[in-house]
Every structure is written in C-alpha cells, then in structure tokens.
Curated annotation (Swiss-Prot):
Membrane topology: Multi-pass membrane protein
Name of the top EC class for this enzyme: translocase
Family: Belongs to the complex I subunit 4L family.
Entry-linked InterPro entries: NADH_UbQ_OxRdtase_chain4L/K, NUOK/Mnh_C1-like
CC terms in the record's Gene Ontology section: mitochondrial membrane; respiratory chain complex I
Protein name per UniProt: NADH-ubiquinone oxidoreductase chain 4L
Catalytic reaction list: a ubiquinone + NADH + 5 H(+)(in) = a ubiquinol + NAD(+) + 4 H(+)(out)
BP GO annotations: ATP synthesis coupled electron transport
Length: 98
C-alpha cells in the first residue's frame, strides 16, 4: 500500500470516527460528512489515473455533484432546525417531540 492510499484511508477513517464521536451539534456532523466526501472524491480522482482507465473519469464529478446537493440539504436542515428548536444540538431533533 502506497503512502497516497494510506492517507486517503486514514482521512476517511478519521472523519468517520469524528462523525461517530462528535454527535452533539449538527454542524459538526455535517463537517465530518463533508470531509468524508472530500476524501472519497480525492480517492476516486486518483484511482482512474493509477488504473489507466479513462472510462471512470466521470465518477468523481458525479460524486462531487451529489456531495454539493448533500451539503445544501444539510445546511437547509441546519437553518430550519435552528429556527424551530433554537439550537443545532442533535438531541433536540427528536421526531417524537414534533
């Protein structure tokens, strides 16, 4: 395993651990999700170059588009939950209380 692969795996693992352990605020969960998507995007961008397959070059761009949609939806949920509940704490977002 090369240093490049190890750095992508460690970035994805650290961001997923951050998502698992820092679950108090919605903004921290969104930042961890975005770092997971960024590390996945970088790994998918390098993979077709190393494998020398030009047919997979569209996959990172498609994943980046879905990541932008996810970020926009997450920020809209953050604004809506902050307006209705007064904070971005995840324990306030219980569906049984609404």
């Amino acid at each position: 395993m090369s240093f490049l692969h190890l750095s992508f795996y460690s970035a994805f693992t650290l961001s997923s651990l951050g998502l698992a352990f820092h679950r108090t605020h919605l903004i921290s969960a969104l930042l961890c999700l975005e770092s997971m998507m960024l590390s996945l995007y970088l790994a998918l961008s390098i993979w077709p170059v190393q494998a020398q397959t030009p047919s997979f070059t569209l996959v990172p761009i498609l994943m980046l588009a879905f990541s932008a949609c996810e970020a926009g939806t997450g920020l809209a949920m953050l604004v809506a939950s902050t307006r209705t509940h007064g904070s971005d704490h995840l324990h306030n977002l219980n569906l049984l209380q609404c």
